[in-house]
Amino acid sequence: MKTKQKIFFAKIIYRLIRIFFPKKIRVKRRGIEWSLNLSEAIDLHIFVFGSFEIKITNVAKKLHLEKYNQIIDIGANFGVQSLQFAKNFTNSKIYSVEPTNYAFNKFIKNLELNQKLSRNIHPFQIFLGSKEKAIPTSIYSSWN
């Protein structure tokens, strides 16, 4: 399916859901509590399908990531992969890196909703890069 078609269907789904549900909602999907904003694509996907990029978690299971005691989630966004990893790899420590204020604050809120899972997640609001230089005062996500 082409991107334009996906966007078209997402708009229809969003409009239908908004008839019955508020824009901001707290839900439980696949054993994880989420604070979602249904006007955002990833949030809407989790609300409708229960997860986002579940293929990453499935590949991690096939690679037997549980035998490793540390997982690094770079570009953690609001914790989608970190929380799924914590749920599936209970003996691993997850180090999550997210530079943007908006996503990081949302990540912290989702960790607070998942106290048991958050014990193994260590969030860091930092930038990773190949050069040492000053960090801009305002940082925006490309999708925000």
Residue ranges and their predicted role:
Residues 1-144:
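Phosphate/nucleotide-binding beta-alpha loop and adjacent structural elements of enzyme active sites
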